[in-house]
Amino acid sequence: MLIPEAKNYLGKDCSVTFSDRHGSLHTHNVHIYDVTFTPMYGACLVADIDDIWLERVTSISAL
């Protein structure tokens, strides 16, 4: 997922499926506050549970 795609979900409650560092998939319902870019790490979603790296997001849908 790219930053412009992720910005469509700002301020919304979403269901986000992402992989962890071990490759396991997790699905969480989150509220997305911001999309940021961190040098050397890449883009991430700032959500109410934690930051989620965009390169690990496999699917996202608004609730």
Question: What residue spans do the PLM features occupy?
Answer:
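Conserved RNA-binding domains used in RNP assembly and mRNA/RNA metabolism
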Residues: 3-63
